[in-house]
Regions:
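N-terminal amphipathic/basic-hydrophobic helices that include classical n-h-c signal peptides
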Residues: 1-9
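A structural boundary/capping signal
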Residues: 10-287
Length: 287
């Protein structure tokens, strides 16, 4: 496989004698030489990548290619980390934007614009099926039908999931995702359609709930939720099913379990799930 970094943004080629000299040192077998060279090239950031790609393509030794790959991965990781920290510092960050940034942890190429177009097409397809006269329950039935019947999205269980099934870009492209990934996709789509649907803190599962706007002003916890959506299947269910589940796992119906999770909480939870799966499977993400 050819190792290339497809960068959508325009990256200027650096005509810097120091960078050229540093790159020539990459074939030095001495690790004591490589470490400071590695750190200095990384400081150039994305500007160094065109030259690094050229070195990778023309390298005669596999060891040199491995070194170049490690530098490029480090540059990418630091760029993603910087953008993610900026996202986290916002008072009300957008969930969709956060997941777009983190998509590059697994995919080296920047697919942002392609994924934006895919999401917009999905939003439009769902919007065409909705109208203002539908009840919230009817609206969710329409959304579920569009996703799981028309668009043919499919959920997979934890035993068969791969790390790719967590990432929003892969789910949009392949139409397959795990419970968490599909749940986040559905919540994002609901937000774009101005539908009231939020991820909840119910232990052990990822479930979406639709709060009753009027009831939620007066009541809390389970009493404020009208119905629930299973992101793996798109099925809607009610209070009786969630109460049965809570009895099975021996959990009380605490109010906090039925409060919506916000973007920062969801992304941090998602990151923990991805890290856990990467450790279990040995899949490589940028680090």
């Amino acid at each position: 496989l050819v190792f290339r970094v497809h960068i959508v943004r325009m990256v200027p080629t650096v005509n810097d004698p120091e960078l050229f000299a540093l790159i020539r040192l990459l074939d030095d077998p001495d690790e004591n030489v490589f470490e400071p060279v590695f750190n200095r090239i990384v400081q150039y950031g994305y500007r160094a990548i065109p030259q690094l790609e050229h070195v990778w393509e023309t390298a005669e030794q596999a060891d040199q290619q491995v070194r170049v790959e490690s530098i490029i991965r480090r540059i990418q990781y630091l760029e993603i980390a910087q953008r993610y920290q900026y996202w986290r510092q916002q008072s009300s960050p957008d969930l969709w934007e956060g997941l777009l940034i983190l998509d590059q942890l697994y995919h080296r190429e920047d697919r942002t614009e392609i994924l934006r177009q895919s999401m917009e097409q999905l939003r439009r397809n769902a919007w065409l099926e909705l109208n203002q006269y539908l009840t919230p329950l009817e609206q969710m039935n329409v959304l579920s039908r569009v996703l799981f019947e028309h668009e043919r999205f499919k959920g997979i269980d934890s035993a068969r999931e791969k790390i790719a099934s967590h990432f929003i870009g892969d789910i949009l492209t392949n139409r397959i995702g795990n419970q968490v990934g599909l749940g986040l996709l559905i919540q994002i789509l609901a937000e774009k359609l101005d539908l009231s649907l939020y991820a909840l803190s119910v232990p052990g599962i990822f479930v979406l709930g639709s709060p009753n706007v009027i009831k939620s002003r007066e009541k809390k916890g389970i009493d404020s939720i009208d119905f629930y959506l299973d992101p793996q299947t798109g099925e809607l269910f009610g209070r009786a099913e969630i109460e049965l589940y809570m009895r099975r796992i021996h959990q009380p119906l605490e109010e906090s379990f039925f409060e919506p999770l916000f973007a920062k909480q969801l992304v941090e939870w998602w990151l923990r799930k991805v890290a856990q799966k990467a450790q279990e499977s040995g899949d490589l993400i940028l680090a």
